[in-house]
Amino acid sequence: MEKYLSVTTLTKYLKMKFDKDPYLERVYLTGQVSNFRKRPTHQYFSLKDDHAVIQATIWSGIYQKLGFDLEEGMKINVIGRVQVYEPSGSYSIIIEKAEPDGVGALAIQFEQLKKKLTEEGLFQERFKQALPQFSKRIGVVTSRSGAVIRDIITTVSRRFPGVDILLYPTKVQGEGAAEEIARNIARANQRDDLDLLIIGRGGGSIEDLWAFNEEIVVRAIFESRLPVISSVGHETDVTLADFVADRRAATPTAAAELATPVTKLDVLTHLQNQEKRMATAVRNVLSKKQEALKKCSQSVIFRQPERLYDGYLQRLDQLQLRLKQSLRTRISDNKQLVQARTHQLVQLSPVTKIQRYQDRLGQLDKLLGSQMALVYDAKVAEAKRLSEALLMLDTSRIVARGYAIVKKEESIVDSVESLKKKDQVTLLMRDGQVELEVKDVKTKEI
């Protein structure tokens, strides 16, 4: 009698066979991705060819390490193991490693990461920083023993001696290189005495240069506060670091030239030209000042200083004339008054009154005489005082006595409060004048 197996028993048997079969423990398989829809964790899809289909699974940890994203219709080569899923009685391949078929995985990864970062805007020109014209200290992230650092040091020393080079010895290829490059870029940005950063290495295969295509390095360059020059490989080599850097140089020598756009010779030439321009400007200023001084010395005021007080002398003459006229008028008026009073007394005729009025008249006459004398003396003294005051205004008399007169913009300076530092003043002396600049102003404490 035949023995019938349960579905479970058969499935378990088949699973045991699959698990123990050495040919199914590590299977090398090629196929086309089908029914793929990217999930946040594990990836489930199908691998097919023209005649068959097999279910495939990639656990999330493995998928994150692939270095590229699966796409519908992509042909891939995978390594994995075949297993049976008992509840459905189906079998599938659990993929442990995968790479695109034909085109290398690195090329796919390059294009996919480039597309991703481009969409994020990391390569846009608006984020590029201008390189400094004069750098005091330049940081270099590269290998300690490579030709890169030697070429940079030689070129910078030739173009602008005195610029410091600070090397960050860095692993530039192989496992851990990308992390070390990113870490040293961040370290350089922590310093306040760096002006610029050069990252790079010499030529090599795409695998050798791959650290400069890693996302961690690209983002470190993008986040750099310091302007970054990328010099990776030869002129024909292109990395993602070149896209995100502020400038790309084909060689380390070219990078050093970009880092020192102005040479020491350029600076010396510029200084010499500036010196010539300043000398010409000084000569022009002196010429204009000398011409202005010549015009001033030829002015009427300097040639005929007495004209400064001509008006005051005329005023003095007028005052003296008015004073004399006033005195004569007053004397005449008083005489007329005396005559009128005398006439009144004569007309009244009483002897006593006449005598009294005569006495009174005599007193008034004396008083009038004394008052007129006082008034006259006062007017004469005032006229003398005004005359002396006018003479004091004569600058030629002042400087003739050994004094000097300070003038600012044609006005006489009578107080330090009207001056300030760097004011231009003229010192008038007996035998000429001196142009001065105020060095300091000190007010006398009272």
Swiss-Prot record:
Protein name: Exodeoxyribonuclease 7 large subunit
GO cellular component entries: cytoplasm; exodeoxyribonuclease VII complex
GO biological process entries: DNA catabolic process
Keywords of the record: Cytoplasm, Exonuclease, Hydrolase, Nuclease
Protein's cellular compartments: Cytoplasm
Subcellular location, principal: cytoplasm
Molecular function terms, GO-annotated: exodeoxyribonuclease VII activity; nucleic acid binding
Subunit structure of this chain's protein: Heterooligomer composed of large and small subunits.
EC number from the UniProt entry: 3.1.11.6
Matches recorded under PANTHER family: EXODEOXYRIBONUCLEASE 7 LARGE SUBUNIT (PTHR30008:SF0)
Entry's family note: Belongs to the XseA family.
HAMAP family xrefs: Exonuc_7_L
Function field: Bidirectionally degrades single-stranded DNA into large acid-insoluble oligonucleotides, which are then degraded further into small acid-soluble oligonucleotides.
Residues passing through the membrane, by range: none
Catalytically driven reaction(s): Exonucleolytic cleavage in either 5'- to 3'- or 3'- to 5'-direction to yield nucleoside 5'-phosphates
Domain of life: Bacteria
